[in-house]
Design a protein with these regions (language model features):
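A compositional/biophysical signature of low hydrophobicity enriched in polar/charged and small residues
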Residues: 1-327
Length: 327
Protein backbone atom coordinates (compact mmCIF):
# COMPACT_ATOMS: atom_id res chain seq x y z
CA UNK A 1 0.00 0.00 0.00
CA UNK A 2 1.37 3.41 -0.97
CA UNK A 3 1.40 5.96 1.88
CA UNK A 4 1.01 8.84 -0.57
CA UNK A 5 -1.90 7.30 -2.48
CA UNK A 6 -4.88 9.65 -2.77
CA UNK A 7 -8.12 9.39 -4.69
CA UNK A 8 -8.62 11.95 -7.45
CA UNK A 9 -11.78 13.12 -9.19
CA UNK A 10 -11.55 10.39 -11.82
CA UNK A 11 -11.33 7.70 -9.14
CA UNK A 12 -14.41 9.21 -7.46
CA UNK A 13 -16.33 9.14 -10.74
CA UNK A 14 -15.42 5.47 -11.22
CA UNK A 15 -16.55 4.72 -7.66
CA UNK A 16 -19.89 6.32 -8.50
CA UNK A 17 -20.27 4.06 -11.55
CA UNK A 18 -19.34 0.90 -9.63
CA UNK A 19 -21.63 1.76 -6.74
CA UNK A 20 -24.61 1.78 -9.07
CA UNK A 21 -23.55 -1.41 -10.89
CA UNK A 22 -20.28 -3.09 -9.98
CA UNK A 23 -20.57 -5.54 -12.90
CA UNK A 24 -20.22 -2.78 -15.48
CA UNK A 25 -17.46 -3.56 -17.94
CA UNK A 26 -14.33 -1.44 -18.17
CA UNK A 27 -15.52 -0.41 -21.63
CA UNK A 28 -18.90 0.86 -20.41
CA UNK A 29 -17.38 2.79 -17.52
CA UNK A 30 -14.77 4.24 -19.87
CA UNK A 31 -17.42 5.28 -22.37
CA UNK A 32 -19.47 7.01 -19.67
CA UNK A 33 -16.44 8.88 -18.29
CA UNK A 34 -14.50 9.39 -21.55
CA UNK A 35 -11.65 7.15 -20.43
CA UNK A 36 -9.86 4.27 -22.11
CA UNK A 37 -10.57 0.70 -21.06
CA UNK A 38 -7.01 0.27 -19.76
CA UNK A 39 -7.19 3.46 -17.72
CA UNK A 40 -10.40 2.28 -15.99
CA UNK A 41 -8.94 -1.19 -15.42
CA UNK A 42 -5.72 0.20 -13.90
CA UNK A 43 -7.57 2.57 -11.58
CA UNK A 44 -10.02 -0.07 -10.34
CA UNK A 45 -7.22 -2.57 -9.69
CA UNK A 46 -5.28 0.09 -7.81
CA UNK A 47 -8.30 0.95 -5.64
CA UNK A 48 -8.72 -2.75 -4.84
CA UNK A 49 -5.02 -3.28 -4.03
CA UNK A 50 -4.93 -0.13 -1.87
CA UNK A 51 -7.99 -1.33 0.04
CA UNK A 52 -10.20 1.59 -1.03
CA UNK A 53 -12.68 -0.83 -2.57
CA UNK A 54 -13.23 -3.25 0.30
CA UNK A 55 -15.65 -5.60 -1.41
CA UNK A 56 -17.80 -6.11 -4.48
CA UNK A 57 -21.23 -7.03 -3.16
CA UNK A 58 -24.44 -8.60 -4.46
CA UNK A 59 -27.58 -6.82 -3.28
CA UNK A 60 -30.42 -9.34 -3.07
CA UNK A 61 -34.16 -9.04 -2.78
CA UNK A 62 -34.40 -11.44 0.15
CA UNK A 63 -38.16 -11.80 -0.32
CA UNK A 64 -37.24 -14.11 -3.21
CA UNK A 65 -35.68 -16.44 -0.63
CA UNK A 66 -38.70 -16.34 1.66
CA UNK A 67 -37.70 -13.52 4.01
CA UNK A 68 -40.42 -11.11 5.14
CA UNK A 69 -38.86 -8.48 7.38
CA UNK A 70 -35.89 -6.15 7.44
CA UNK A 71 -34.84 -4.98 10.90
CA UNK A 72 -32.25 -2.34 11.76
CA UNK A 73 -31.05 -2.33 15.37
CA UNK A 74 -28.79 0.47 16.56
CA UNK A 75 -26.65 -0.40 19.56
CA UNK A 76 -24.17 1.79 21.41
CA UNK A 77 -21.33 -0.29 22.84
CA UNK A 78 -19.56 0.91 25.98
CA UNK A 79 -16.14 0.08 27.37
CA UNK A 80 -16.97 0.10 31.06
CA UNK A 81 -16.15 -2.82 33.37
CA UNK A 82 -19.64 -4.26 33.07
CA UNK A 83 -19.92 -3.80 29.29
CA UNK A 84 -21.14 -6.76 27.28
CA UNK A 85 -19.01 -8.38 24.61
CA UNK A 86 -19.52 -8.11 20.87
CA UNK A 87 -20.06 -11.91 20.85
CA UNK A 88 -23.01 -11.51 23.24
CA UNK A 89 -24.53 -8.93 20.92
CA UNK A 90 -24.01 -11.08 17.81
CA UNK A 91 -25.40 -14.20 19.51
CA UNK A 92 -28.52 -12.30 20.55
CA UNK A 93 -29.08 -10.83 17.09
CA UNK A 94 -28.59 -14.22 15.43
CA UNK A 95 -31.51 -15.50 17.49
CA UNK A 96 -33.67 -12.80 15.90
CA UNK A 97 -32.57 -13.16 12.28
CA UNK A 98 -29.63 -13.25 9.88
CA UNK A 99 -27.16 -10.36 10.04
CA UNK A 100 -26.74 -8.82 6.61
CA UNK A 101 -24.68 -5.76 7.47
CA UNK A 102 -22.81 -4.13 10.36
CA UNK A 103 -22.34 -0.38 10.10
CA UNK A 104 -20.14 1.33 12.68
CA UNK A 105 -20.82 5.05 12.92
CA UNK A 106 -18.93 8.05 14.19
CA UNK A 107 -19.78 8.41 17.87
CA UNK A 108 -19.66 4.75 18.86
CA UNK A 109 -22.97 3.34 17.63
CA UNK A 110 -23.29 0.25 15.44
CA UNK A 111 -26.29 -0.42 13.23
CA UNK A 112 -26.98 -4.10 12.57
CA UNK A 113 -29.22 -4.80 9.57
CA UNK A 114 -31.04 -8.12 9.97
CA UNK A 115 -33.10 -10.11 7.49
CA UNK A 116 -35.89 -12.10 9.16
CA UNK A 117 -38.02 -14.89 7.73
CA UNK A 118 -41.19 -14.20 9.67
CA UNK A 119 -43.13 -11.04 10.38
CA UNK A 120 -42.18 -9.92 13.86
CA UNK A 121 -43.48 -7.45 16.40
CA UNK A 122 -41.49 -4.29 17.16
CA UNK A 123 -42.16 -4.49 20.90
CA UNK A 124 -41.05 -8.13 20.97
CA UNK A 125 -37.66 -7.32 19.43
CA UNK A 126 -37.17 -4.27 21.59
CA UNK A 127 -38.02 -6.00 24.87
CA UNK A 128 -35.88 -9.05 24.03
CA UNK A 129 -32.93 -6.81 23.19
CA UNK A 130 -33.32 -4.70 26.34
CA UNK A 131 -33.64 -7.84 28.50
CA UNK A 132 -30.49 -9.36 26.98
CA UNK A 133 -28.24 -6.35 26.55
CA UNK A 134 -29.68 -3.80 28.97
CA UNK A 135 -31.53 -0.54 28.22
CA UNK A 136 -28.36 1.57 28.02
CA UNK A 137 -27.09 -0.33 24.97
CA UNK A 138 -30.15 -0.12 22.73
CA UNK A 139 -30.46 3.10 20.75
CA UNK A 140 -33.12 2.39 18.11
CA UNK A 141 -35.05 -0.42 16.45
CA UNK A 142 -36.50 -0.02 12.97
CA UNK A 143 -38.74 -2.71 11.48
CA UNK A 144 -39.82 -2.99 7.87
CA UNK A 145 -42.61 -5.53 7.72
CA UNK A 146 -44.45 -7.05 4.72
CA UNK A 147 -43.11 -8.21 1.41
CA UNK A 148 -43.24 -4.79 -0.24
CA UNK A 149 -40.77 -3.27 2.19
CA UNK A 150 -38.05 -5.78 1.53
CA UNK A 151 -38.36 -5.46 -2.22
CA UNK A 152 -35.96 -2.94 -3.77
CA UNK A 153 -37.24 0.04 -5.72
CA UNK A 154 -36.62 -1.90 -8.93
CA UNK A 155 -38.92 -4.76 -7.95
CA UNK A 156 -41.27 -5.74 -10.78
CA UNK A 157 -43.05 -9.01 -10.04
CA UNK A 158 -42.24 -12.22 -8.17
CA UNK A 159 -41.44 -15.49 -9.87
CA UNK A 160 -40.40 -18.89 -8.66
CA UNK A 161 -36.64 -19.43 -8.62
CA UNK A 162 -35.64 -22.61 -10.44
CA UNK A 163 -32.66 -24.74 -9.42
CA UNK A 164 -30.62 -23.18 -12.22
CA UNK A 165 -31.64 -19.70 -11.05
CA UNK A 166 -30.47 -20.59 -7.54
CA UNK A 167 -27.17 -21.97 -8.79
CA UNK A 168 -26.53 -18.78 -10.77
CA UNK A 169 -27.51 -16.74 -7.72
CA UNK A 170 -25.09 -18.71 -5.53
CA UNK A 171 -22.21 -18.14 -7.97
CA UNK A 172 -22.93 -14.41 -7.97
CA UNK A 173 -23.09 -14.23 -4.17
CA UNK A 174 -19.77 -16.09 -3.88
CA UNK A 175 -18.12 -13.93 -6.54
CA UNK A 176 -20.09 -10.88 -7.76
CA UNK A 177 -17.38 -10.25 -10.39
CA UNK A 178 -17.44 -13.73 -11.92
CA UNK A 179 -17.51 -13.71 -15.71
CA UNK A 180 -20.28 -15.26 -17.77
CA UNK A 181 -17.90 -17.79 -19.38
CA UNK A 182 -16.54 -18.90 -16.00
CA UNK A 183 -20.03 -19.25 -14.55
CA UNK A 184 -21.13 -21.22 -17.59
CA UNK A 185 -18.20 -23.60 -17.08
CA UNK A 186 -18.82 -24.00 -13.34
CA UNK A 187 -22.53 -24.70 -13.73
CA UNK A 188 -22.27 -26.76 -16.94
CA UNK A 189 -24.87 -24.64 -18.72
CA UNK A 190 -24.51 -22.49 -21.81
CA UNK A 191 -23.34 -18.89 -21.62
CA UNK A 192 -26.60 -17.93 -23.32
CA UNK A 193 -28.58 -19.53 -20.49
CA UNK A 194 -26.47 -17.76 -17.85
CA UNK A 195 -26.95 -14.43 -19.62
CA UNK A 196 -30.70 -14.95 -19.84
CA UNK A 197 -31.02 -15.87 -16.16
CA UNK A 198 -28.82 -12.98 -15.02
CA UNK A 199 -30.88 -10.53 -17.07
CA UNK A 200 -34.10 -11.93 -15.60
CA UNK A 201 -32.77 -11.75 -12.04
CA UNK A 202 -31.74 -8.12 -12.54
CA UNK A 203 -34.89 -7.03 -14.38
CA UNK A 204 -37.06 -8.79 -11.80
CA UNK A 205 -35.39 -6.90 -8.96
CA UNK A 206 -33.90 -10.07 -7.46
CA UNK A 207 -30.28 -8.91 -7.57
CA UNK A 208 -28.25 -5.77 -8.06
CA UNK A 209 -24.52 -5.18 -7.68
CA UNK A 210 -22.60 -2.56 -5.75
CA UNK A 211 -19.40 -2.04 -3.77
CA UNK A 212 -18.43 -1.42 -0.16
CA UNK A 213 -15.66 1.07 0.50
CA UNK A 214 -13.23 0.90 3.40
CA UNK A 215 -13.51 4.17 5.39
CA UNK A 216 -10.06 3.62 6.93
CA UNK A 217 -8.45 3.60 3.47
CA UNK A 218 -10.13 6.77 2.23
CA UNK A 219 -7.40 9.21 3.17
CA UNK A 220 -8.80 12.72 3.22
CA UNK A 221 -12.41 11.57 2.70
CA UNK A 222 -15.29 10.38 4.84
CA UNK A 223 -18.18 8.15 3.84
CA UNK A 224 -21.43 9.76 4.80
CA UNK A 225 -24.95 8.68 4.13
CA UNK A 226 -28.17 10.63 3.93
CA UNK A 227 -31.34 8.74 4.77
CA UNK A 228 -34.19 10.66 3.16
CA UNK A 229 -37.89 10.21 3.90
CA UNK A 230 -39.94 11.56 1.00
CA UNK A 231 -43.42 13.03 1.31
CA UNK A 232 -45.43 10.61 -0.80
CA UNK A 233 -45.09 7.26 -2.51
CA UNK A 234 -46.88 7.72 -5.83
CA UNK A 235 -45.22 5.21 -8.11
CA UNK A 236 -44.01 5.73 -11.65
CA UNK A 237 -42.73 3.15 -14.11
CA UNK A 238 -39.28 3.49 -15.66
CA UNK A 239 -39.27 0.82 -18.32
CA UNK A 240 -39.79 -2.42 -16.41
CA UNK A 241 -38.90 -0.76 -13.10
CA UNK A 242 -41.01 0.96 -10.45
CA UNK A 243 -39.96 3.95 -8.41
CA UNK A 244 -41.57 6.52 -6.15
CA UNK A 245 -42.21 9.75 -8.06
CA UNK A 246 -40.90 11.86 -5.16
CA UNK A 247 -37.88 9.56 -4.78
CA UNK A 248 -37.15 9.94 -8.48
CA UNK A 249 -37.33 13.75 -8.22
CA UNK A 250 -35.05 13.81 -5.17
CA UNK A 251 -32.46 11.58 -6.86
CA UNK A 252 -32.51 13.77 -9.96
CA UNK A 253 -31.99 16.89 -7.85
CA UNK A 254 -29.12 15.27 -5.97
CA UNK A 255 -27.37 14.38 -9.22
CA UNK A 256 -28.02 17.80 -10.76
CA UNK A 257 -27.28 20.03 -7.76
CA UNK A 258 -24.33 18.17 -6.25
CA UNK A 259 -22.27 16.92 -9.21
CA UNK A 260 -19.07 17.25 -7.16
CA UNK A 261 -20.07 14.30 -4.96
CA UNK A 262 -19.77 10.68 -6.16
CA UNK A 263 -23.32 9.63 -5.41
CA UNK A 264 -24.91 6.21 -5.34
CA UNK A 265 -28.20 4.88 -4.18
CA UNK A 266 -27.67 2.69 -1.16
CA UNK A 267 -28.96 -0.86 -1.47
CA UNK A 268 -29.83 -1.27 2.19
CA UNK A 269 -33.38 0.05 2.26
CA UNK A 270 -36.19 -1.01 -0.01
CA UNK A 271 -39.09 1.17 1.04
CA UNK A 272 -40.71 3.29 -1.65
CA UNK A 273 -40.72 6.48 0.44
CA UNK A 274 -37.16 6.12 1.75
CA UNK A 275 -33.91 6.79 -0.07
CA UNK A 276 -30.48 5.96 1.29
CA UNK A 277 -27.73 7.68 -0.64
CA UNK A 278 -24.05 7.29 0.02
CA UNK A 279 -21.51 9.99 -0.72
CA UNK A 280 -17.82 10.74 -0.30
CA UNK A 281 -16.74 14.13 0.96
CA UNK A 282 -13.63 15.90 2.26
CA UNK A 283 -15.12 19.15 3.56
CA UNK A 284 -17.37 18.84 6.62
CA UNK A 285 -18.69 22.39 6.22
CA UNK A 286 -19.71 21.64 2.63
CA UNK A 287 -21.26 18.33 3.71
CA UNK A 288 -23.33 20.11 6.36
CA UNK A 289 -24.42 22.73 3.82
CA UNK A 290 -25.40 20.02 1.35
CA UNK A 291 -27.39 18.18 4.03
CA UNK A 292 -29.29 21.32 5.01
CA UNK A 293 -30.18 21.95 1.39
CA UNK A 294 -31.49 18.39 1.01
CA UNK A 295 -33.68 18.96 4.06
CA UNK A 296 -35.20 21.97 2.30
CA UNK A 297 -36.32 20.01 -0.78
CA UNK A 298 -40.11 20.19 -1.06
CA UNK A 299 -40.27 16.44 -1.69
CA UNK A 300 -38.39 15.67 1.55
CA UNK A 301 -40.27 15.07 4.79
CA UNK A 302 -37.12 14.64 6.87
CA UNK A 303 -33.53 13.48 6.50
CA UNK A 304 -30.80 12.00 8.68
CA UNK A 305 -27.03 12.31 8.28
CA UNK A 306 -24.73 9.42 9.21
CA UNK A 307 -20.94 9.11 9.02
CA UNK A 308 -19.62 5.55 8.65
CA UNK A 309 -16.32 4.37 10.12
CA UNK A 310 -16.56 0.65 9.28
CA UNK A 311 -18.81 -1.63 7.22
CA UNK A 312 -18.94 -5.42 7.40
CA UNK A 313 -21.03 -7.42 4.94
CA UNK A 314 -22.17 -10.96 5.86
CA UNK A 315 -23.10 -13.50 3.21
CA UNK A 316 -22.32 -16.99 4.59
CA UNK A 317 -25.92 -17.36 5.74
CA UNK A 318 -27.16 -16.51 2.23
CA UNK A 319 -25.11 -19.36 0.77
CA UNK A 320 -26.52 -21.74 3.40
CA UNK A 321 -30.06 -20.61 2.58
CA UNK A 322 -29.55 -21.16 -1.15
CA UNK A 323 -27.96 -24.57 -0.50
CA UNK A 324 -30.96 -25.58 1.63
CA UNK A 325 -33.24 -24.81 -1.30
CA UNK A 326 -31.06 -26.76 -3.71
CA UNK A 327 -30.97 -29.89 -1.52
Amino acid sequence: MQDNYRLDKTDLAIIGQLSRDSRLSYEKIGSALHLTRNSVKTRIRRMVSEGTIQEFVPVLNYAALGYKTTCSIEIRETHSRDSITRKTIIDHLNRIGDIFLEIEELGGSTVFVLIIKESIDYDKIRSATVNTLGPSFLQNVFLRNSNSTIQPHTYMKPYILTNTDLRVLKSLVLDPQIGIAEMSKQLSVSARTVNRILARLKDGGIIEFSIILNPAALKGYVIFAVLIYVNEIEVIKKGSKRESLASHKVLQRLHNEFPEYPLWRGPFTGIDNEILVGLLGNDLTAIDSMFRKVQSFEEVNKAELHIFTKLVHHKDWVIKEIDSRLN
